[in-house]
């Protein structure tokens, strides 16, 4: 359309100037040439306009695409931000082993421990036992898992495979009824006392004090509750027996166990005061009990003091416990009385034991951890691998046990123990112990029938857990 108008205008101009007259014939060729040039210029202009229009369309299309992409990016960023606000479906944390936790409240964590012991116990003159002298063993090899279930529930299942077999240790379900009240059903520890309830991972010596091993403390099947309010902890439960012993359908034992703890902060220190009470009905017509203890270490299967079997219908135990932690220093001690009720008019003996212990960290900034009425995991201030040497602790313990009463002469012991504990990182420990034990009226006679003698024991342990 634009070219046609220009052509008509050009013809009109030519006619007005006399382009059609015969006198101007000589100029026709020049005019025609000019018109041709004008047409070429107009065609070029039209082509340029078409090109610009095409480029404009392309630019519009690109702008639209950019706007669409920007909108998509904005939407994607908003979605990512919203997703970031929501917890991951499954989170993984590391606490010695991976712990898997879901947004719905489930969690699962494998757990285990390995304790390898070696040691030697001297042999009094005249006593020959292959268990004395040097020995070594895998003291514990636990494998299991624990976790949480939505609704305030929790669980733990664990076995010990150290002794060429499988022994169930913990196997229970928990319920946190409120912030203060927790319930447990299944196989777990009754509430004996401070050292017994403290995990063997966190002990001061390789073995617990004699009073905590002589009277048959063990995990039992039962139902229990723990109430905590401020500085006070109240624990109680009803138990039968260890699940392995319940394979005997004649085992009808039933016990009631309770413990109260008062644990206030005193200045810069943590105080622990407690007491426990235990009553157990054996519920068997031919029932008996036996109290005895190894010489400081677990490697020898020999007991220098031993009551032998005592016919019994029930047991009554009661104990006191105390502890204090301030900075690198700790002190703790327990006493326990165990009374045996015998059938008919037989005399009811009462046996007694206790220990007193002090300890000190030699490394700066380290302290014995305390939590929920028991001693807890030591976390070195300067662990190996982070520029430090870990935590080093020295412990001293006096250990007493009296198994003589009511006509039963099982012997007495006075033990003097020293231990060195090195914790390079919180999940690994190395322990070295020495114990000197003096026996009177011992169960095993030495040369010439002598029942008053002493033994020395040295033990070491390497352990890790996860």
Model-derived segments and spans:
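Sec/Tat signal peptide C-region and signal peptidase I cleavage site
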Residues: 19-25
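N-terminal periplasmic/intermembrane-space "pro-region" immediately following the signal or transit peptide
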Residues: 25-115, 362, 366-379, 466
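Outer membrane beta-barrel
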Residues: 95-283, 350-386, 393-406
């Amino acid at each position: 359309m634009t070219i046609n108008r220009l052509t008509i205008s050009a013809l009109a101009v030519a006619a007005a100037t006399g382009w059609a007259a015969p006198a101007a014939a000589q100029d026709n060729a020049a005019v025609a040439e000019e018109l041709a040039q004008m047409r070429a210029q107009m065609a070029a202009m039209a082509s340029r306009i078409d090109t610009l229009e095409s480029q404009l369309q392309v630019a519009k299309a690109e702008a639209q695409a950019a706007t669409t992409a920007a909108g998509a990016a904005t939407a994607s960023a908003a979605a990512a931000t919203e997703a970031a606000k929501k917890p991951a479906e499954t989170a993984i944390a590391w606490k010695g082993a991976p712990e898997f936790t879901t947004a719905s409240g489930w969690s699962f964590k494998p757990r285990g421990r390995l304790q390898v012991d070696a040691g030697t116990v001297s042999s009094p003159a005249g006593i020959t036992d292959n268990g004395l002298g040097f020995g070594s063993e895998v003291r514990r090899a636990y494998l299991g898992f624990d976790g949480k279930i939505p609704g305030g529930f929790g669980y733990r299942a664990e076995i010990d495979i150290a002794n060429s077999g499988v022994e169930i240790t913990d196997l229970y379900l928990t319920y946190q009824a409120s912030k203060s009240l927790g319930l447990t059903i299944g196989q777990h520890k009754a509430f004996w006392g401070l050292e017994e309830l403290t995990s063997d991972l966190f002990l001061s010596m390789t073995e617990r004090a004699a009073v905590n091993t002589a009277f048959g403390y063990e995990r039992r099947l039962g139902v229990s509750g723990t109430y905590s309010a401020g500085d006070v902890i109240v624990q109680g439960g009803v138990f039968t027996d260890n699940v392995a012993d319940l394979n005997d359908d004649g085992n009808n034992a039933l016990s009631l166990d309770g413990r109260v703890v008062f644990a206030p902060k005193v200045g810069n220190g943590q105080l622990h005061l407690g007491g426990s009470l235990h009553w157990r009905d054996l519920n068997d017509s031919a029932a008996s009990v036996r109290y005895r203890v190894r010489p400081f270490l677990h490697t020898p299967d020999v007991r220098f003091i031993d009551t032998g079997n005592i016919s019994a219908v029930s047991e009554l135990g009661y104990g006191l416990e105390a502890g204090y932690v301030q900075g690198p220093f700790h002190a703790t001690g327990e006493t326990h009385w165990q009374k045996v009720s015998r059938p008919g008019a037989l005399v009811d003996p009462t046996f007694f034991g206790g220990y007193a212990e002090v300890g000190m960290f030699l490394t700066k900034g380290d302290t014995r951890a305390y939590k929920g009425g028991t001693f807890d995991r030591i976390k070195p201030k300067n662990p190996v691998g982070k520029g430090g040497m870990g935590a080093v602790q020295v412990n001293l313990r006096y250990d007493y046990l009296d198994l003589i009463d009511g006509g039963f002469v099982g012997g007495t012991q006075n033990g003097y123990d020293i231990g060195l504990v090195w914790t390079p990182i919180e999940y690994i420990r190395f322990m070295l112990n020495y114990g000197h034990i003096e026996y009177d009226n011992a169960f095993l006679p030495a040369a010439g029938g002598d029942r008053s003698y002493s033994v020395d024991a040295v033990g070491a342990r390497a352990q890790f857990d996860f």
